[in-house]
Amino acid sequence: MSGGMQNGTQETERRVIDINDRHTVNVGPQHPATHGVLRLIMELEGETVTRADPHIGLLHRGTEKLIEYKSYLQAVPYFDRLDYVSPMCCEHAFALATERLLGVKVPERAQWIRVLFAEITRILNHLLNAVHLALDIGAQSPSLWGYEEREKLLTFHEAVSGARFHANYFRPGGVSKDMPTGLAEQIWEWSEKFPKFLDDLQSLLNENRIFRQRLVDIGVISAEDALAMGFSGPNLRASGIAWDLRRAQPYDKYDEVDFDIPVGRHGDSFDRYLVRIREMAESLKIIRQALKAMPEGPIKVQDHKITPPKRAEMKRSMEALIHHFKLYTEGYHVPAGTTYTAVEAPKGEFGVYLVADGSNRPYRCKIRATGFSHLQAMNLMSKGHLLADAIAVLGSIDIVFGEVDR
């Protein structure tokens, strides 16, 4: 046998052995570490990941199509069920998009209330992600602390909307109802105690040897790759890009508040965790500024073709009663036009491309889910790491499948 043929045979044998050494594992969709219904098909050499292939769609409900058959007001609750960890921020994008097409200006108080609850929602989201990331890699205590703190914030949600999660609170034209008496004082009192909790959480995790070993230099993504993959939010900022829509394209009252944009340097899982921790402190600053700056006044536009009249007014005025009936049976007609409106949701850029045809229903509502872009980088970030590290990477990018699958 010639040398060339012999080398070729050896190469073929080596390739066969390499392929046979690999095995395929299904992670999920019914697994607590996948944070929902993700199915990850992972190709492993021993315990080292050579390929991670996310399979999505198991929570697809046809949200975008369903919205086309609802009035603009009836469409709002669908947004609560997208990123159900931070529902008010999803409502925010749709409300802003509809208002832009309607050409209405929301009252000052309503804008400040939106900013206030958008930041409370951001803390709810980041807190859940931080303690669940710790839980994914074996630390149980932080999750117990975190849930206790989240319960206080969910009480504020419930006070304004009547619901802990599916708030249906941000409406086109303002918010559904005003903050109850005493709630602002309760939020202020909570804001004075929260920094101590945040310090305690960091003292438990930041310098913990096992926590750092599981996250530092794991799932690194460069700034160039993050931009190419369409990253946004904390995942992009952890790679060193200081991009935040609240600063770059301010909406509501974000141009009147002072806050810093935390940025990472290494783009690894630990930086993604740290950016979210720092963002909670910045959100707290915004909450306190919003409480100080919030004026008295109406909480929705005074056009009763868009927002309902007060109950007392309906008992006195037939016109108000007709407005109420028309609003909740037919809805309002939005002038023909298109808009893309995005907000800085806790997970990144959550956008709504809204097409109106002059009727009382959206002609098209395309939703830009933040997690969709982040999930496609799982293969890039997991390759070469151990299987257990891939779970840590997944936890660090903060995925919710309500919005990914829609």
UniProtKB/Swiss-Prot annotation:
Gene: nuoD
Keywords on record: Cell inner membrane, Cell membrane, Membrane, NAD, Quinone, Translocase, Transport, Ubiquinone
Database matches in Pfam families: Complex1_49kDa
Localization of this protein: Cell inner membrane
Membrane disposition: Peripheral membrane protein
One term under GO cellular component: plasma membrane
Record's protein name: NADH-quinone oxidoreductase subunit D
Chief location of this protein within or outside the cell: membrane
Function of the molecule: NDH-1 shuttles electrons from NADH, via FMN and iron-sulfur (Fe-S) centers, to quinones in the respiratory chain. The immediate electron acceptor for the enzyme in this species is believed to be ubiquinone. Couples the redox reaction to proton translocation (for every two electrons transferred, four hydrogen ions are translocated across the cytoplasmic membrane), and thus conserves the redox energy in a proton gradient.
Subunit architecture: NDH-1 is composed of 14 different subunits. Subunits NuoB, C, D, E, F, and G constitute the peripheral sector of the complex.
One Gene Ontology term of the molecular function aspect: NAD binding
InterPro entries listed in its UniProt record: NADH_Q_OxRdtase_suD, NADH_UbQ_OxRdtase_49kDa_CS, NDH1_su_D/H, NiFe-Hase_large
Domain of life assignment: Bacteria
Catalysed transformations (reactions): a quinone + NADH + 5 H(+)(in) = a quinol + NAD(+) + 4 H(+)(out)
Family, per entry: Belongs to the complex I 49 kDa subunit family.
Its EC number(s): 7.1.1.-
